[in-house]
Curated annotation (Swiss-Prot):
<dbReference type="GO" id="GO:0008982">
    <property type="term" value="F:protein-N(PI)-phosphohistidine-sugar phosphotransferase activity"/>
</dbReference>
<feature type="active site" description="Tele-phosphohistidine intermediate">
    <location>
        <position position="70"/>
    </location>
</feature>
<dbReference type="GO" id="GO:0005737">
    <property type="term" value="C:cytoplasm"/>
</dbReference>
<dbReference type="InterPro" id="IPR016152">
    <property type="entry name" value="PTrfase/Anion_transptr"/>
</dbReference>
<dbReference type="GO" id="GO:0016301">
    <property type="term" value="F:kinase activity"/>
</dbReference>
<keyword id="KW-0963">Cytoplasm</keyword>
<dbReference type="Pfam" id="PF00359">
    <property type="entry name" value="PTS_EIIA_2"/>
</dbReference>
<keyword id="KW-0598">Phosphotransferase system</keyword>
<dbReference type="InterPro" id="IPR051541">
    <property type="entry name" value="PTS_SugarTrans_NitroReg"/>
</dbReference>
<comment type="function">
    <text>The phosphoenolpyruvate-dependent sugar phosphotransferase system (sugar PTS), a major carbohydrate active transport system, catalyzes the phosphorylation of incoming sugar substrates concomitantly with their translocation across the cell membrane. The enzyme II PtfABC PTS system is involved in fructose transport.</text>
</comment>
<feature type="domain" description="PTS EIIA type-2">
    <location>
        <begin position="8"/>
        <end position="152"/>
    </location>
</feature>
<keyword id="KW-0808">Transferase</keyword>
<dbReference type="InterPro" id="IPR002178">
    <property type="entry name" value="PTS_EIIA_type-2_dom"/>
</dbReference>
<keyword id="KW-0597">Phosphoprotein</keyword>
<dbReference type="InterPro" id="IPR004715">
    <property type="entry name" value="PTS_IIA_fruc"/>
</dbReference>
<keyword id="KW-0813">Transport</keyword>
<feature type="modified residue" description="Phosphohistidine; by HPr">
    <location>
        <position position="70"/>
    </location>
</feature>
Length: 154
């Protein structure tokens, strides 16, 4: 699968411009439910367990106001990335102690190890650029968010 095809891994229904819950676990469940509602997750409980287990191993608060909870799980059959943002920011235990305002949840099938790493590294690289983060924070539509991601994830 071409993991750089944003419209496939992050269709519009996986993008939320609503304020997510203010806790890390609440925000993770909010992102997961976007994927569940879009029919991308076969087993919500298994996906949530995988995300929280991964979160327990090491923080997914990567700094710069970004949180990227992620997991490999058989609860999904294709790579899935959900997006939400928080005006206030959510404590994701980032190394720079900054709250996460941009949230990306990555779920890939257990056998899709390469996809997982490709998506994570492409997102991480693009989000290091302040102008990209600003565009995502200021986007007024789901389509704009998707367009920004499509532009920067190669």
């Amino acid at each position: 699968m071409d993991v750089t095809d944003i419209s496939t891994i992050t269709p519009l229904e996986l993008i939320s411009l609503e304020e997510p819950p203010a806790t890390k676990e609440g925000a993770i469940e909010f992102l997961l439910d976007l994927a569940v509602d879009a029919g991308r997750v076969d087993d919500r409980d298994a996906a949530l367990d995988a995300l929280l287990e991964r979160e327990g191993e090491a923080t997914t608060g990567v700094g710069f106001g970004i949180g990227i909870p992620h997991a490999k799980t058989d609860a999904v059959s294709k790579p899935t990335v959900a997006f939400a943002r928080s005006a206030e920011g959510i404590d994701f235990d980032a190394m720079d102690d900054k709250p996460a305002k941009l949230l990306f949840m990555i779920l890939v099938p257990a056998a899709g190890g390469e996809d997982h790493l490709q998506i994570l590294s492409a997102l991480s690289r693009s989000l290091m650029h302040e102008d990209v983060r600003e565009k995502l924070l200021e986007a007024e539509s789901k389509q704009t968010v998707q367009d920004v991601l499509a532009e920067v994830v190669e």
